[in-house]
């Protein structure tokens, strides 16, 4: 139960989770907030002892968290063609943002079909979803910046929010800057 934190959190913010046996907190992006139920949905990949410890928690277990942290996304009012661009574990913090937008496009990039997450959640939330995988095992083969270039060239992109690996973010920011499209990266 996250109580007021679920009401205060904004799309793109994150939490610090204190993991047993570790001095360090794990930063985990907020995927979905459920204000009425006072809950936050966190999506993460097990990569070390902290996230391994988290993966053994069960429903009803208590976690110590510090939240909400970070600025979050603040899309401009009235965007007609908003686009969210996510890569890998940068996809979860964009879900809540996409759900808050009118007719968003979600360009989601993954290593493979096996690594793909939340695509149906984005669709249920009202987004037009295009998946790109490095190996072509799901959706289109290539980089997630390719369909973004196409949308910009077609005039179907007037705001971009992106989250993912640094090289992807640098490419997205450069495309946005070149086309004078408002862009936020995280």
Segments (PLM) and residue ranges:
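Ferredoxin-reductase
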Residues: 1-59, 111
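FNR/FR-type flavoprotein reductase catalytic core
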Residues: 49-186
């Amino acid at each position: 139960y996250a109580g007021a934190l679920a009401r205060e959190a904004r799309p793109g913010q994150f939490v610090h989770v204190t993991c047993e046996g570790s001095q360090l907190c794990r930063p985990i992006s907020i995927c979905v907030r459920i204000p009425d139920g006072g809950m936050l949905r966190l999506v993460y990949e097990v990569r070390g002892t902290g996230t391994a410890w988290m993966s053994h928690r069960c429903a009803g277990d208590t976690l110590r968290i510090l939240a909400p942290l970070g600025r979050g996304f603040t899309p401009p009012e009235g965007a007609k063609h908003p686009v969210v661009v996510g890569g890998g574990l940068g996809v979860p913090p964009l879900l809540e943002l996409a759900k808050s937008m009118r007719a968003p496009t979600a360009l989601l990039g993954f290593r493979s079909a096996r690594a793909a997450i939340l695509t149906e959640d984005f669709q249920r939330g009202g987004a037009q979803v295009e998946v790109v995988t490095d190996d072509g095992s799901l959706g289109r083969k290539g980089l997630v910046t390719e369909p973004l270039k196409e949308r910009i060239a077609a005039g179907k992109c007037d705001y971009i929010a992106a989250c993912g690996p640094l090289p992807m973010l640098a490419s997205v920011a450069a495309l946005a800057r070149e086309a004078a499209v408002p862009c936020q990266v995280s």
